[in-house]
A protein has these predicted regions:
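Beta-strand-rich binding-surface signature
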Residues: 32, 178, 257, 289, ...
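Beta-rich nucleic-acid/ligand-interaction surfaces
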Residues: 18, 240-248, 255, 294-308
Length: 308
């Protein structure tokens, strides 16, 4: 599934006209561009713009507004209205761009999976950025500005007596997360009583994975590494029951709770990384015949999927 010759990430240093043209021309399997804005409900937009159109007007996409939509396509409650619905997408060149591959569609010329370059964007309404990513970005800028001013007024910081607040030039916010989720066989549900008993007896926590669950988890960790997220581990969580084996040796009645962990990052990049990780998890487990839920409480009465 992972190919070392394929492109997975384009860093901010490479997001200029010359380098992008060289990279995308060298990878003809990347056939589309998608501009990813995140609305107030956490939905990330996705489109399929031909790569030829992007390269033809690359300066316009990079410097101007990459695309536009109307307020009915995104959740911007109280902002985009019927008589003022235009929402523009402005490319964010301060974070990594990722190539999203279709595991079921192959380029006839190269034999590789067809890829879509996903470019994170800000959603702009009336020349004001109004999306979730911009709120996080602006909040961090504001907090940094206020803290730097505070440190200059009060240079002696408790616990940091060895430095002066006046010498602090920049504050870098780092953040990390863990992703818990439930996986199950489609159209098959485990009894709540069995799930509750298994949880009380701690039968599943950090236990060995088997069958397609193990395969999917291992493939997920490999893909997180390919995208540069720095995976640290994947393991079973406290919820779930043992799956069953059918006459052909395949796992059935799978119902398990898993967790994935990867390295910390900075500000908005951390949020983008989690969106990418969710897509990777969903796609890989689907290819292995399993459904994934990131809901906080998908199964009543048993452990939910926390995040901290």
């Amino acid at each position: 599934m992972m190919n070392p010759d394929m492109l997975y990430v384009i860093s901010p240093e490479e997001q200029n006209r010359e380098t992008l043209t060289e990279i995308l021309t060298a990878h003809p399997e990347i056939k589309f561009v998608s501009f990813m804005g995140v609305d107030f409900a956490g939905n990330d937009t996705d489109e399929k713009v031909p790569i030829s159109l992007f390269l033809k007007d690359i300066d316009g996409f990079l410097e101007g507004m990459a695309a536009q939509t109307d307020g009915s396509s995104v959740v911007l409650t109280g902002i985009a209205t019927l008589n003022n619905a235009r929402v523009d997408m402005k490319i964010d060149s301060s974070v990594n761009w990722y190539i999203d591959y279709n595991y079921e569609h192959f380029d006839s010329a190269t034999g590789r999976m067809v890829g879509t370059l996903r470019i994170p964007c800000f959603l702009v309404h009336n020349n004001v950025r109004v999306d979730s990513r911009s709120i996080l970005h602006d909040t961090l800028d504001y907090v940094e500005k206020e803290l730097l001013e505070l440190f200059k007024k009060h240079p002696q910081i408790a616990g940091l007596e060895h430095i002066s607040g006046e010498d602090i030039e920049k504050i870098i916010f780092t953040c990390a997360t863990e992703l818990e989720f439930w996986v199950k066989s489609p159209r098959e549900d485990a009894p709540i009583e069995a799930l509750s008993s298994s949880q009380m007896m701690q039968e599943q926590y950090w236990q060995r994975c088997r069958g397609n669950v193990r395969t999917a988890l291992e493939q997920t960790v490999e893909m997180l590494e390919a995208y540069g997220l720095g995976p640290e581990m994947g393991h079973k969580e406290c919820g779930g029951v043992r799956g069953q084996i059918d006459d052909n040796g395949h796992m059935t009645h799978v119902m398990e709770q898993l967790e994935g962990d990867w390295k910390y990052s900075y500000g908005v990049q951390t949020a983008d990384n989690e969106l990418l990780a969710r897509i990777i998890v969903k796609e890989i487990f689907r290819l292995n015949g399993l459904e994934v839920s990131f809901q906080a409480k998908p199964v009543p009465g048993v452990a939910g999927s926390g995040e901290h």
